């Protein structure tokens, strides 16, 4: 929609009149309004503002959401309502009224034009609303309609008349006509009234500049003729007064002729009454109106003195306003008529009123400058026409100086004046034109001087408690005095001597000289202790040196012939002031000054350091002649000592710092001394205890004497960088500032290149972090520095790397690497020695630093600029680092200490480096486009690397091993990018290399190709030939032969190239090899551990090819494996994993072999138990080494252990006993295996033990081994949060132990469970578990684990799978186990949990636990309990002949169990209600229907049932069984009554009256009826008399 929407014809003339603002205006006709807004429009007629605002919101919403233009009837109705709604007292109603108008304008577009005359008045008036939100809403309408300057101009011309008409109507309204006094408070009535008047006046003021003189004169005159208007100056509303004054001023400025007829009213309101009225908030506007009226009509002031008329207003000051009041007042006073006879006579009173106002408590202090300026201007005007009398000056000017110099209560009405005001005041004094005034001024200054001198003389002694305060006050007064003197003398001629009293400056100078003499005399008399006098002298020498230049005052202050005076000066508080005096005269009197300096320094140095430091600091802080300072050897030594103290780590005193700064800024120390200091500081940076942590000394030297460090900026720069890295953030920021300063002064790139070179060549704890070097190297590289300038030396890198390649590789690497047994072949070079490696503080060695740095640089450059030798070193470093990481080598390229946090951090860094290396390798491979076709001309980067690495893989050294490993990585990268090479060219190249043979020179190279290309060489003839030769050569080898090991290693790697059972060798040859292997195992002592491991691998890999071959070697192989497992118990942890893992894999492959031969099956069966025992004994091996190899071994071993048959575990009790101990193993895998076995075996073992316990009537208890585990409660305090999140093994062992305890509960009967519970209760074991549980899960801190957020379902709560738990994080595993254990605790030990809960003191824990229980556990346990009841009810044993089945009904919705026992077609029934907090809250048993027993007996059954449930660990089924037993017991022996043929009588009782003759039992009630009917007291059966009934029965009582 286009804004405005009005035609080009603009705003025409309209005949419609404005709507009434009165509340009694007739309501609009709503009959034509649409139905959807008729109700809101009716609500607008109501009085309540809330109702109105809601109605407006509803109408607004309807207009906005409607797709159709608004109906004309709505616009018409709104035009009638808008004027009154727009002035409502509620700001929200007013704002919404304008918002609604805007939406109507948008919707109606041009159709609104005819209604605008009715709307324009309240709309424009709304733009002047005091509330900003309301005004903003009204202005939004203006912005929409008047969206161009042309439209604005037309609008104001077209609607001037309507706006004037609206204003005239508004000004004639009254508070009673605008509001209904019956329903509106007086305050609200006045607020609306003033709001209407204020906006109408503001609108008129806005219109006045646009109305031409001949336009609407009647309307404007009519507005000013309104009687109401002239009463508004006395309004209580400041905004109304302000609007009135602004309107009058606007009339005077724009239409003065219209106002002239009302001049009498104007004079009355503005001049006569205005100053007398309260003008807070409107005073400035009143003054502006007075200025306007005075300019146009000065006669308005009448004959009375204007000062007298203004005095009431002036006396009140700005009344909380700004300094504009005084500015406007000054302008008004400047144009006031002064012709009245009493003008001068009223001046003193007027000035007094001004002073009172200026210094009143209500006057803002920031107004003082403008106020005093106005005051002085006023005095100047008053005195301009005549010479003021001395009395006038004494009363109205002189006190200003007195108050400024020495504030007192007597002159408090002159406070807050500043020197410019004092100067101006004295300029008003006609000193040279009037003798009386001159005499008065001289007397005033002499009095001021005498008073000040007396104050100095009478200053308090040092012993006085107010000594400091009084001295400072006098010092400040002296400073103010000579500030004034400085101002007085500044404008005088330079040659003027200021002698005599010819002019005012001379009088001031003469007085000041006397004052200085008094101050000097006071110092001499009182041993220089009154430092206020010294301060006065300093003020004179620094601010008015012309007064001191030609006097001998300075010589009196420093008497050269009085050494004692100098001793007194240096120890006095006057020293800083006097030193400043000396500094001021030094340029004019150098010889005298030098003599004084020497004496002062000698006196100061006699006090030594640090006592003399404050004295020397003062002396060197003023311009001290260099010759004096640098010639004094004692002073030089003193300042050097100060610098050394300043540089110390312990904070120096501020005085020492100030002394050092002064010594630099004033060149007190010679360059030679500073050079020595700088060199010493540069060396000590970074040395603990020798450097200032604030670096103030270094910063000071660098900023002022940077040339001092020119010989060693690199060393200093490096030291600072190192400090920056290891310091806290605050200190690091300071170091960075110093470092940046050096970098800026000496050139960044040049410094950094040298720093990088030196930092890469060395490594120590102070070395720069490698990431810092990388970051800055990249910045330098981007600035255009060649890459070669930034790279490390390949020779140095190679040398440093070789020192790590002299160690034999860790044997366990044969487990983790595809190189397998190749690690057994690498032997330490002859003559090599282990050296302590240099490392940085992150444990990185020099080659590690170089590798990280270079790899990061190479990631951002083209491969064409990369050097092949550095690439080769990166890949060699990477394969070595990968192996170090695999075995967690403590002293490898990175130091990997035992600390878990440090090890994890450094492991992550190694992995990041390896990832970068892999990416770089992929780039190298990708750049070798000719590889796929086999076109290998040796020119590509990859081929150059292959040739270089092949040249190094020519022996059995560790370097050859890692060169071949790097070669393997390169081959794999090439295959990954390009696939396997094919074609004759590649075969020719491959064959030409001649490496597929088993010689010491070719073994590693062959392994590199076999592992690098893997199955890609399966079709190679050269590989097949090598395989056949190796199989043949094995047959002729002996264990002790040097070539045996590398032949077997190479054979095993060849076997890995081919799929199982598809090797290119005859089975016969493989059988011979198998025989040879089993022959070697007959002499185990001749075999090295490496050969042992490789033999097991060989048999394992040959096995699929010879599975159908019969022979003794199967049993021999198994026996050898068992032998190895036993041998491992006495071997080193570095060696035994290498052969144990392949032996386990060999046994596992035998067990899982498809269609094995009978010999193998027989061997496996015969050794089954031995293997089970041996496997479990392997679990007991120590876990001193934790690395990837050991983890692989543990996982493999645990998988094998899990397959142990249950019968082996139950039949061999020793095995189970050993497993309990393994639950506390340091290996998670071993713990898992032990738990898995115990989890399976424990229920079976417990079943047998429980049977024995019940038969032999022993007390059952939890196994002692389990009790010892759950009694070893872990101390959580020794773990950090991060360590605890890693689920420490001792915490895991403890929790798994508890899981096994509950496993024992699971299969045990009630009696045994109770005995278990008693044993746990005795040692308080469960409490410790619960405390640990809720500490870990967050309940103790009030932040319980959110099971929903952590995706723990009901299934997780009910069950725990140890193997599945290891798939997530360790922290989640711990949380899951704890969550499940709490469930088991509630299920099996609710009584103990409840006891712990009731004793719990922590309210926070209790609250967290309550909500947790109610949300997650209670519903599950209630469901379990109801399921258990259902199962019990459905599995009840068939009742005996005289018994009935207990009928049980479960109501899950009500959480209730009902049980009934049928007796004579009725049911004795109870209800068991389960609370929401079950099982921590007890169930409630209610007796629903009593049958067969009296109330007392019945209640005892109900209580007994509840007691059984409560004390049977919450078992509802036990309670039901007890209830059934009680009923059956009560009915036992009771037969039907022979009279009624029922067991239970009508009064719900059993037969209890026996005939002594026939022994039959009868109901009492039945006998009674029988007696009544038969009229006999005889037995119904035997007819013999029964005399057993009591009197009550005979009376028909029938009760007990």
UniProtKB/Swiss-Prot annotation:
Enzyme class, first EC level, given as a word: transferase
Pathway in which this enzyme or protein is active: Protein modification; protein ubiquitination
MF term (GO), any: ribosomal large subunit binding
Catalytic function, reaction form: S-ubiquitinyl-[E2 ubiquitin-conjugating enzyme]-L-cysteine + [acceptor protein]-L-lysine = [E2 ubiquitin-conjugating enzyme]-L-cysteine + N(6)-ubiquitinyl-[acceptor protein]-L-lysine
Zinc fingers, RING-type class: 1537-1583
Localisation: Nucleus; Cytoplasm, Cytosol
Keywords annotated in UniProt: Cytoplasm, Metal-binding, Nucleus, Repeat, Transferase, Ubl conjugation pathway, Zinc, Zinc-finger
Cleaved signal peptide residues: none
Gene Ontology process terms (BP): protein ubiquitination; rescue of stalled ribosome; ribosome-associated ubiquitin-dependent protein catabolic process
Any single GO CC term annotated in Swiss-Prot or TrEMBL for this entry: RQC complex
InterPro entries listed in its UniProt record: ARM-like (IPR011989), ARM-type_fold (IPR016024), LTN1/Rkr1 (IPR039795), LTN1_E3_ligase_6th (IPR054477), Ltn1_N (IPR054476), LTN1_UBC (IPR054478), RING-CH-C4HC3_LTN1 (IPR039804), TPR_Rkr-1 (IPR057030)
Assembly and oligomerization: Component of the ribosome quality control complex (RQC), composed of the E3 ubiquitin ligase RKR1/LTN1, RQC1 and RQC2, as well as CDC48 and its ubiquitin-binding cofactors associated with the 60S ribosomal subunits.
Protein family: Belongs to the LTN1 family.
Protein name stated in the entry: E3 ubiquitin-protein ligase listerin
Gene expressing this chain: rkr-1
């Amino acid at each position: 929609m286009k804004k405005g929407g009005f035609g080009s014809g603009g705003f025409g003339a309209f005949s419609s009149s404005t709507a009434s603002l009165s509340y009694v205006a007739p309501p609009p006709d709503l009959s034509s309004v649409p139905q959807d807004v008729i109700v809101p429009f009716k609500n607008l007629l109501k009085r309540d503002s809330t109702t109105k605002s809601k109605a407006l919101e509803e109408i607004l919403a309807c207009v906005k959401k409607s797709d159709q233009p608004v109906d004309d009837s709505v616009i018409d109705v709104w035009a009638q309502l808008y004027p009154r709604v727009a002035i409502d007292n509620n700001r929200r109603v007013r704002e919404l009224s304008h918002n609604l108008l805007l939406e109507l304008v948008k919707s109606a577009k041009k159709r609104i034009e005819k209604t605008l005359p009715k709307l324009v008045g309240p709309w424009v008036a709304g733009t002047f609303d005091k509330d900003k939100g309301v005004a903003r809403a009204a202005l939004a309408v203006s912005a929409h309609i008047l969206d161009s300057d042309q439209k604005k101009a037309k609008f104001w011309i077209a609607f001037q008349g309507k706006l004037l008409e609206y204003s005239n109507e508004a000004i004639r309204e009254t508070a009673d006509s605008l509001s209904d006094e019956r329903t509106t408070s007086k305050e609200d009535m006045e607020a609306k009234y003033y709001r209407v008047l204020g906006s109408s006046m503001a609108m008129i003021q806005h219109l006045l500049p646009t109305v031409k003189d001949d336009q609407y004169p009647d309307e404007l005159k009519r507005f000013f003729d309104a009687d109401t208007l002239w009463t508004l100056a006395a309004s209580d509303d400041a905004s109304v007064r302000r609007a009135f004054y602004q309107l009058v001023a606007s009339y005077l400025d724009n239409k003065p002729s219209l106002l002239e007829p009302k001049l009498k009213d104007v004079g009355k309101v503005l001049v006569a009454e205005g100053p007398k009225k309260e003008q807070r908030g409107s005073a400035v506007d009143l003054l502006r109106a007075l200025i306007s009226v005075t300019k146009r009509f000065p006669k308005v002031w009448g004959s009375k003195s204007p000062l007298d008329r203004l005095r009431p207003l002036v006396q009140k000051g700005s009344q909380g306003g700004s300094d504009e009041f005084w500015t406007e007042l000054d302008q008004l006073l400047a144009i006031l008529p002064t012709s009245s006879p009493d003008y001068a006579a009223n001046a003193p009173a007027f000035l007094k009123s001004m002073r009172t106002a200026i210094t009143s408590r209500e006057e803002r202090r920031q107004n003082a400058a403008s106020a005093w300026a106005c005051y002085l201007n006023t005095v100047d005007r008053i005195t301009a026409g005549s010479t003021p009398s001395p009395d006038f000056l004494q009363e109205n000017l002189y006190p200003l100086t007195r108050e400024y110099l020495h504030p007192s209560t007597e002159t408090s009405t002159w406070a807050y004046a500043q020197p410019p005001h004092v100067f101006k005041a004295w300029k008003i004094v006609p000193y040279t034109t009037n003798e009386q005034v001159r005499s008065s001024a001289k007397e005033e200054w002499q009095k001021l001087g005498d008073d000040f001198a007396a104050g100095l003389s009478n200053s308090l002694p040092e012993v006085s408690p107010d000594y400091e305060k009084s001295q400072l006050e006098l010092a400040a007064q002296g400073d103010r005095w000579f500030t004034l003197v400085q101002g007085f003398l500044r404008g005088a001629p330079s040659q003027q001597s200021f002698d005599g009293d010819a002019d005012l400056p001379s009088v001031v100078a003469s007085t000041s000289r006397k004052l200085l003499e008094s101050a000097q005399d006071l110092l001499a008399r009182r041993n220089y202790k009154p430092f206020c006098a010294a301060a006065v002298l300093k003020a004179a020498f620094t601010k008015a040196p012309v007064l001191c230049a030609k006097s001998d005052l300075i010589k009196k202050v420093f008497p050269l012939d009085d050494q004692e005076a100098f001793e007194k000066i240096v120890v006095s508080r006057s020293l800083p002031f006097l030193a400043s005096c000396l500094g001021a005269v030094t340029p004019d009197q150098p010889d005298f000054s030098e003599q004084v300096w020497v004496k002062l320094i000698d006196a100061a140095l006699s006090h030594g350091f640090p006592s003399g430091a404050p004295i020397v600091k003062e002396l060197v802080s003023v311009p001290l002649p260099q010759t004096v300072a640098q010639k004094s050897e004692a002073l030089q030594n003193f300042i050097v000592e100060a610098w050394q103290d300043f540089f110390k780590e312990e904070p120096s005193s501020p005085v020492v710092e100030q002394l050092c700064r002064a010594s630099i800024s004033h060149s007190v120390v010679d360059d030679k001394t500073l050079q020595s200091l700088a060199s010493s500081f540069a060396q000590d940076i970074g040395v603990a205890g020798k450097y200032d942590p604030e670096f103030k000394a270094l910063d000071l030297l660098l900023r002022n004497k940077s040339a001092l460090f020119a010989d060693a900026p690199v060393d200093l720069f490096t030291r600072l960088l190192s400090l920056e890295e290891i310091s806290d953030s605050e200190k690091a920021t300071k170091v960075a500032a110093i470092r940046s300063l050096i970098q800026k002064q000496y050139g960044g790139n040049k410094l950094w290149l040298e720093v990088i070179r030196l930092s890469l060549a060395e490594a120590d704890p102070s070395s720069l972090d490698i990431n810092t070097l990388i970051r800055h190297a990249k910045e330098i590289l981007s600035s255009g520095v060649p890459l070669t300038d930034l790279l490390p030396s390949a020779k140095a890198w190679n040398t440093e790397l070789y020192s790590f390649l002299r160690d034999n590789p860790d044997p366990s690497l044969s487990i983790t690497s595809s190189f397998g047994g190749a690690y057994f072949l690498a032997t330490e070079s002859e003559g090599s020695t282990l050296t302590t490696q240099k490392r940085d503080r992150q444990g990185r060695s020099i080659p590690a630093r170089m590798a990280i740095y270079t790899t990061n640089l190479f990631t951002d450059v083209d491969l064409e600029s990369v050097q092949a030798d550095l690439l080769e070193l990166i890949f060699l470093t990477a394969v070595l680092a990968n192996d170090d990481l695999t075995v967690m080598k403590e002293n490898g390229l990175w130091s990997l200490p035992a600390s878990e946090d440090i090890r994890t951090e450094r492991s992550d860094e190694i992995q990041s480096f390896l990832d970068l290396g892999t990416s770089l390798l992929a780039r190298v491979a990708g750049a070798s486009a000719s590889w796929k076709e086999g076109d290998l001309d040796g020119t590509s980067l990859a081929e150059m690397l292959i040739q270089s690495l092949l040249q190094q893989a020519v022996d059995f050294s560790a370097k050859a091993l890692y060169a071949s490993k790097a070669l393997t990585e390169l081959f794999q990268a090439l295959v990954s990018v390009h696939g396997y090479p094919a074609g004759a060219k590649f075969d020719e190249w491959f064959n030409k290399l001649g490496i597929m043979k088993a010689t010491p020179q070719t073994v590693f190279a062959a392994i590199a190709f076999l592992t690098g290309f893997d199955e890609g060489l399966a079709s190679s003839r050269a590989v097949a030939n090598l395989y056949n030769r190796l199989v043949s050569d094995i047959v002729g080898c002996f264990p002790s032969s040097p070539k045996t090991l590398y032949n077997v290693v190479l054979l095993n790697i060849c076997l890995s190239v081919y799929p199982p059972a598809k090797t290119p060798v005859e089975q016969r040859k493989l059988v011979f090899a198998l025989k040879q292997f089993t022959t070697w195992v007959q002499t185990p002592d001749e075999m090295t551990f490496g050969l042992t491991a490789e033999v097991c691998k060989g048999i394992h890999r040959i096995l699929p090819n010879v599975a159908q071959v019969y022979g003794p070697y199967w049993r021999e192989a198994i026996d050898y494996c068992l032998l190895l497992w036993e041998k491992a118990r006495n071997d080193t942890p570095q060696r035994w994993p290498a052969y144990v893992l392949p032996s386990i894999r060999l046994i596992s492959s035998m067990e899982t072999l498809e269609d094995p031969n009978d010999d193998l099956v027989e061997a496996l069966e015969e050794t089954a138990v031995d293997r089970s025992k041996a496997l479990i004994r392997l679990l007991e091996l120590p876990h001193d080494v934790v690395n990837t190899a050991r983890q692989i071994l543990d996982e493999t071993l645990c998988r094998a252990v899990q397959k142990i048959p249950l019968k082996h575990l139950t039949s061999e009790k020793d095995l189970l006993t050993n497993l309990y101990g393994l639950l506390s193993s340091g290996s998670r895998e071993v713990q898992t295996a032990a738990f898995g076995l115990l989890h399976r075996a424990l229920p079976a073992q417990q079943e047998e033990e429980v049977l024995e316990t019940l038969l032999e009537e022993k007390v059952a208890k939890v196994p002692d081994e389990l009790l010892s585990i759950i009694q070893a409660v872990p101390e959580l305090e020794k773990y950090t949060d991060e360590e605890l999140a890693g689920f420490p093994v001792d915490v895991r062992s403890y929790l798994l132990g508890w899981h096994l305890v509950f496993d024992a509960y699971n299969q045990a009967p009630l009696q045994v469970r109770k005995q278990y519970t008693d044993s746990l209760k005795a040692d308080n074991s469960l409490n410790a578990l619960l405390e640990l549980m809720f500490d870990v899960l967050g309940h103790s801190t009030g932040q319980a684990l959110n099971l929903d957020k952590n995706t723990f379902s009901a299934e997780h709560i009910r069950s725990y799978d140890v193997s599945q738990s290891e798939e997530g994080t360790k922290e989640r595993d711990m949380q899951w186990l704890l969550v499940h254990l709490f469930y088991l605790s509630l299920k099996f030990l609710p009584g103990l949990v409840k006891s712990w809960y009731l004793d719990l003191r922590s309210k926070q824990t209790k609250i967290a636990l309550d909500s947790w229980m109610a949300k997650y556990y209670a519903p599950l346990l209630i469901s379990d309990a109801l399921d258990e009841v259902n199962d019990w009810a459905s599995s009840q044993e068939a009742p005996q002949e005289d018994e009935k089945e207990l009928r049980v009904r479960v109501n899950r919705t009500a959480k209730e169990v009902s049980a009934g026992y049928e007796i004579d077609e009725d049911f004795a029934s109870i209800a068991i209600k389960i609370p929401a907090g079950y099982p921590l809250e007890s169930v409630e048993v209610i007796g629903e229907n009593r049958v067969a027993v009296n109330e007392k007996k019945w209640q005892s059954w109900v209580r007994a049932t509840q007691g059984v449930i409560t004390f049977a660990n919450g078992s509802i089924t036990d309670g039901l069984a007890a209830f059934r037993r009680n009923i059956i017991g009560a009915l036992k022996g009771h037969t039907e009554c022979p009279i009624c043929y029922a067991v239970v009588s009508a009064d719900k009782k059993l037969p209890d009256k026996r005939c002594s003759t026939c022994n039959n039992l009868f109901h009492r009630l039945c006998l009674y009826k029988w007696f009544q009917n038969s009229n006999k007291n005889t037995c119904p059966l035997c007819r013999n008399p029964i005399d057993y009934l009591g009197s009550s029965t005979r009376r028909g009582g029938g009760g007990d």
